[in-house]
């Protein structure tokens, strides 16, 4: 087991909608009880450490879900910690599929290493998810990822995710040991990025360059990622959580990080003249329930962000339920214990068992209008600008990545920044170089800094092209529907449209102005067809709120007229024929 070596020092970072019709509730806004009646035995930790790994105690194994049984059958992290991936990579898929354990290794346990087998749609091919704290990557890292996917031809591509991360596709198992080595050499890891682990820490994509930033989030997210993965060597204390767990550090009034949908969100706040963070906990999406994060009534100094993260993770790991998989996210535990009961369990796990109450207010301006990241914008550094590029539904090819890396080196500082809207920012560009950058073919032909207004806010998950859980195809359909809608109506203000292929909501439809969640529907003849549930009214920024279900089971072929109608009624869009007649 690797030892953890992280210095918990905070750098000097601090510086000074319409009402929607509701046909169904998309999110749970109910506040957990302050105190809940809980039997003392319920507070006994359900896991214990054995030979360096955290294991579910035998007395708590009745009624556990299949994934928990799989973890007990073989510890997933042994594939990384004890070289199991090397042996697995030498086996043929035929050999692997003949053995129950090996088959579950490639289908489930490899997710602890960030590898997802696409058995249903691309047998023998894997998606690899990285860790990219705060969404920052270098040109060298980008070139390496391009070299990986290029060898896979039409099966190889990469996606920008809604957690400021890279996912690369087309990977074959025999290449994995060499890929992992290459990732390490360029300062990347895929470790602990899937299944019951902490996902990529999200922050302000403008950290350190933002004219209006409250605090630079990048150093904090780097610390969080180093802690969570033990400097990319594996932190076994947090690889057996009841379910996945999301964290973000908020750095500006814009709330680019979407704190209301994270399990833990650090909200900048001053208390007694000291800079630190108020804490929100419990936000999540799932097919069963969507819940907005709630205040923990806790404040920590900037020096203590790791300590409180550790305490919250330990409370969740120790006490979270492991039965029905749809009721294992941290908010279910908060509901069961009550917010004060959960807080007390966190306090027990803090040094000296102390945790200050929240500052009266955080530093977020409540009436702040969220800024646009796409386009050319000045930085806080005189003479420098950043350029936000629109990446249509987040999809890039190997040649695109090489070109992006070249642009980052030629015009910037060799750095790219990914956003939760699946776009990319090139920072630190000398103003004298802007004209040349804007004239580059890649920006003219592929990744525009001035996309059409409806394309600008378009987000889409992987869809059933690659994902076995997706019910519908999303990326190509999102582009096609949006293109057709643009031909029919003129829109004068941004409208964010998100697509997700299934109720897991990787496309985060509940935060969109208009969201589309894949489902099976019935056409005019009553026959099953691909469809979508439509959501309206999601808000982001300082007035964040989850949207509501507007209409169920709309056949995909009927979405264009519905979207046109919504845009005209709720967003001031004008039909093209009317616009032309008025002109």
From Swiss-Prot:
Cellular component GO terms held in the UniProt record: chloroplast
Residues annotated for siroheme binding in this entry: 506
Protein name: Ferredoxin--nitrite reductase, chloroplastic
Organismal lineage: Eukaryota, Viridiplantae, Streptophyta, Embryophyta, Tracheophyta
Subunit comment: Monomer.
Cofactor: siroheme; [4Fe-4S] cluster
Cofactor note (record): Binds 1 siroheme per subunit. Binds 1 [4Fe-4S] cluster per subunit.
Organism: Betula pendula (European white birch)
Compartments it resides in: Plastid, Chloroplast
EC number: 1.7.7.1
Any Pfam family the entry gives: NIR_SIR_ferr
Biological-process GO terms, alphabetical: nitrate assimilation
Keywords, sorted A to Z: 4Fe-4S, Chloroplast, Electron transport, Heme, Iron, Iron-sulfur, Metal-binding, Nitrate assimilation, Oxidoreductase, Plastid, Transit peptide, Transport
